[in-house]
Amino acid sequence: MMLEKLQITSKTLIIFLLSISFSSAEILNPDSAISPKEVVSIQLSGLQKNDLKYKDSGIEQTWNFAHPNNKKVTGPLGKFKRMIKGASYQMMIDHLSHTITELGSSDKWAQFE
């Protein structure tokens, strides 16, 4: 009886760990349930560990949350990657740390530094 419970617990734990590893490889999509500060955090954390999930996954995560008007100017994705790796933004890739401070917000906008 005890051995059977241990086997079931072990199988459940293995399935849980596998589901975590598969879900961590996914790029998050914009969702109204994600707060503006969380969006900034997702983008900065992705760039901080740019190649963690796969090559340039952090840049792709940042691109995924970019405003459609921004994408029109900075896209497609390949062009956006080159821009982020260029002189103006390269310090964001694999940066050591960051802080996010809210400067102000309303129902329609939020500003952070």
Positions of predicted regions on the chain:
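Bacterial N-terminal signal peptides
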Residues: 11-21
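Alpha-helical scaffold domains
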Residues: 30-31
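Short, aromatic-enriched amphipathic alpha-helices that serve as compact interaction elements
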Residues: 35-51, 61, 65
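Short solvent-exposed beta->alpha transition segments
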Residues: 53-107
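Short beta-strand segments that buttress and anchor functional surface loops
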Residues: 111-113
